[in-house]
């Protein structure tokens, strides 16, 4: 082995500033309105935004979902109508029909272009109707659709209480869910559970994940004696976590850099920079990093990770030695690539619409470390990739699997390249130790389909159909 071979490989970043495809960030309404149960989302935009939401959500109007579309008309754009009066009328109707704890205004490209001052209108509307109004500019000017959640959470972070409530009524309201979870349990059991935690500064997690994931990740930290003080967003707006100066915060998704910045600058919180808890390797590194910050010796993580890898060996055999190519869509690419490399795959290229190197620094370091341990080359990271150039590279490299946005899936399949929609990873449960099988189920599905076609002798028919 030469000296050059022994040197650690460095990450190679490129920026093509080309045309790539991703959804509009207003799609964040699809999962956030379900996560925050007492909220109402009002998207202020054109008919195009309405058509997109209607198609993306797939919720019939009879279901009375907790979101609506405020369509801008010619009178709004030409300033013939008064924005304040129109929004006040809509908010009063929302209060009368649904009476939410918070109304979230989602700005769109059009509100940006016509310079609609939503931030200026919101405080006055809020005082008149008596319901908090949060303004989030989750418009198509962002790089990726997942950044819509980032914008909403950054806006909500500024609404988190700065100190714990002192009034009994406020305490009752904020602890309603906790009381429900402890219903039927003896007081001694609750006190004993509290004594299991180590004394450490308060820790708040941020990132919208399904309730089972919240429970799983909180339990993983509880096993190490770490108590999670709260989650942003909470199940209810009235239960937003208290964030005081000096509190520690940790993100569970790679696309929340704006929220992290807001928590550090506005709320003076301390960010724990760690790999994200995606896959057993990422979850272990995430827990270990939090433990190291609180000077806690982690226990049982190595055995837990080994057990998970052993339980998914049947899936690993399908992808070990195969190659993957990320076209870039939802900002989960770095974490997923690192996980798949750990599974035994090689990654040619990681396309990503936007790369915050500070927020993802720990994940990038972990990617390099994983590549070195697995003995594979470090993939090139292409920011704002040009899809035309990517298609040329895919044609040359011929990867076994391409993880891509929906726009390119069918054209690539028609050229004999196996694909997987990246949007599926956004909505699937991929965090924590317990969901490793779910990620591998998604990744291996196209490969298993190809194997089934081959076994049935239909592979030749499929190739003829492509021609």
From Swiss-Prot:
Question: Any idea which positions bind [4Fe-4S] cluster?
Answer: 24, 49, 109
The residues forming a coiled coil are: none
Q: Which GO biological process entries does UniProt record here?
A: light-independent chlorophyll biosynthetic process; photosynthesis, dark reaction
Tell me which UniProt keywords the record has, alphabetically. Answer: 4Fe-4S, ATP-binding, Chlorophyll biosynthesis, Iron, Iron-sulfur, Metal-binding, Nucleotide-binding, Oxidoreductase, Photosynthesis
Pathway(s): Porphyrin-containing compound metabolism; chlorophyll biosynthesis (light-independent)
> How is the co-factor bound, per the entry?
Binds 1 [4Fe-4S] cluster per heterodimer. The cluster is bound at the heterodimer interface by residues from both subunits.
Keyword Oxidoreductase tagged: yes
Tell me the InterPro entries matching this sequence: LIPOR_BchN/ChlN, Nase/OxRdtase_comp1, Protochl_reductN
Top-rank lineage group of the source organism: Bacteria
Q: What is the protein name for this chain?
A: Light-independent protochlorophyllide reductase subunit N
Q: Which organism is it from?
A: Leptolyngbya boryana (Plectonema boryanum)
Gene label: chlN
């Amino acid at each position: 082995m030469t000296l050059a071979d022994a040197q650690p490989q460095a990450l190679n970043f490129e920026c093509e500033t080309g045309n790539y495809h991703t959804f509009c960030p207003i799609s964040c309404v699809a999962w956030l309105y379900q996560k925050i149960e007492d909220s109402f989302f009002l998207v202020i935009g054109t008919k195009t935004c309405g058509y997109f939401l209607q198609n993306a959500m797939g919720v019939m109007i009879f279901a009375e979902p907790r979101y609506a579309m405020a369509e801008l008309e010619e009178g709004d754009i030409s300033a013939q109508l008064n924005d304040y009066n129109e929004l006040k009328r809509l908010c009063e109707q929302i209060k009368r029909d649904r009476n939410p704890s918070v109304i979230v205004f989602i700005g769109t490209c059009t509100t940006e272009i016509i310079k609609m001052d939503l931030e200026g209108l919101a405080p006055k509307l809020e005082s008149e109707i008596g319901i908090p109004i949060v303004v989030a500019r989750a418009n198509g000017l962002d790089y990726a659709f997942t950044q819509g959640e980032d914008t909403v959470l950054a806006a909500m972070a500024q609404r988190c209480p700065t100190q714990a409530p002192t009034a009994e009524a406020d305490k009752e309201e904020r602890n309603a869910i906790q009381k429900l979870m402890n219903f039927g349990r003896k007081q001694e059991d609750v006190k004993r559970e509290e004594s299991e935690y180590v004394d450490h500064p308060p820790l708040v997690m941020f990132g919208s994940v399904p309730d089972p994931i919240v429970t799983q990740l909180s339990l993983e930290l509880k096993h190490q004696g770490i108590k999670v003080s709260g989650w942003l967003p909470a199940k209810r707006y009235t239960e937003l976590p208290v964030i005081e100066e000096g509190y520690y915060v940790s993100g569970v998704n790679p696309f929340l850099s704006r929220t992290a910045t807001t928590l550090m600058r506005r709320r003076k919180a301390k960010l724990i920079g760690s790999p994200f808890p995606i896959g057993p390797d990422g979850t272990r590194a995430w827990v270990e990093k939090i433990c190291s910050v609180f000077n806690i010796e982690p226990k049982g993580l190595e055995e837990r990770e080994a057990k998970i890898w052993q339980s998914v060996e049947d899936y690993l055999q399908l992808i070990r030695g195969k190659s993957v190519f990320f076209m870039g869509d939802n900002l989960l690419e770095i974490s997923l690539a690192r996980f798949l490399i750990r599974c035994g795959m090689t990654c040619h290229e990681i396309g990503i619409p936007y790369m915050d190197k500070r927020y993802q620094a720990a994940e990038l370091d972990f990617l390099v470390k994983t590549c070195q341990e697995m003995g594979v080359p470090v993939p090139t990271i292409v920011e704002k990739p040009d899809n035309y150039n990517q298609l040329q590279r895919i044609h040359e490299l011929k990867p076994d699997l391409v993880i891509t946005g929906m726009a390119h899936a069918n054209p690539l399949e028609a050229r004999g390249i196996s694909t997987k929609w990246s949007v599926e990873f956004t909505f699937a449960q991929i965090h924590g130790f317990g969901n490793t099988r779910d990620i591998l189920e998604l990744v291996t599905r196209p490969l298993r389909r190809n194997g089934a076609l081959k076994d049935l002798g239909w592979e030749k028919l499929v190739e003829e159909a492509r021609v």
